[in-house]
UniProtKB/Swiss-Prot annotation:
Compartments where found: Cytoplasm
Keyword Zinc set for record: no
EC id: 3.1.26.4
CC per GO annotation: cytoplasm; ribonuclease H2 complex
EC category name: hydrolase
Residues in RNase H type-2 domain copies: 11-197
Organism: Actinobacillus pleuropneumoniae serotype 5b (strain L20)
Protein origin, superkingdom: Bacteria
GO molecular function terms noted in the UniProt entry: manganese ion binding; RNA binding; RNA-DNA hybrid ribonuclease activity
Catalysis performed (reactions): Endonucleolytic cleavage to 5'-phosphomonoester
Family in the record: Belongs to the RNase HII family.
Taxon lineage: Bacteria, Pseudomonadati, Pseudomonadota, Gammaproteobacteria, Pasteurellales
Protein name: Ribonuclease HII
């Protein structure tokens, strides 16, 4: 991890990250992780920079070694009702609330922080700078990819396992061909257009 980031002076620090703000389908998934200082995990990095195999291995190690971890989510209906930013903040609040040890301080990837009952700080590129945020990004990514694999079994014609719900050429073609599933985000412009909303 880079040394430019100065950790807050706190005993229990949770890292929080989200996956799935951009896709047209499925929940936005967040994770909160408090790492054990005496049980380091080698190879933590931004989940987007790791191979799927490495992510899966690290996710198991994080779950085994972290002091505690929790996932949060906001469903497509919530995203449509609140908008993606507010739904993401809600999912982050849920991840932090789900921790069975309350952190003293929360570090959140990006430039915005949700309202939390403890001090928090946003960290730009936090998934590359802060071990706790990297761990959260890995857990959230693995969980969301698993959900997309399950959705792919339910709706094999859409190719969800390939594009993970992101707005790719293939996804647009399948939307045109088959219409939207109940899991598509109806407030997102390409889906809205297909549904004629």
């Amino acid at each position: 991890m880079s040394t430019n980031f100065i950790y807050p002076n706190a005993h229990l620090i949770a890292g929080v990250d989200e996956v799935g703000r951009g896709p047209l389908v499925g929940a936005v998934v967040t994770a909160a992780v408090i790492l054990a200082p005496n049980n380091p995990i080698e190879g933590l990095a931004d989940s987007k920079k790791l191979s799927e195999k490495k992510r899966l291995l690290l996710a198991e190690e994080i779950k085994a070694k972290a002091l505690c971890w929790s996932l949060g989510r906001a469903e497509p209906e919530e995203i449509d009702r609140l908008n993606i930013l507010h739904a993401t903040m809600l999912a982050m609040q849920r991840a932090v609330a789900g921790l069975n040890i309350q952190p003293d301080f929360v570090l959140v990837d990006g430039n915005r922080i949700p309202t939390l009952p403890m001090p928090a700080q946003a960290v730009i590129k936090g998934d590359s700078l802060v071990a706790e945020i990297s761990a959260a990004s890995i857990l959230a990514k693995v969980a969301r990819d698993q959900e997309m694999a399950e959705l792919d079994v339910q709706y094999p014609e859409y190719g969800f396992a390939k594009h993970k719900g992101y707005p790719t050429k293939l996804h647009f073609e399948k939307l045109e061909q088959f219409g939207a599933t109940p899991f598509h985000r109806k407030s997102f412009a390409p889906v809205k257009k297909i549904l004629g909303l």
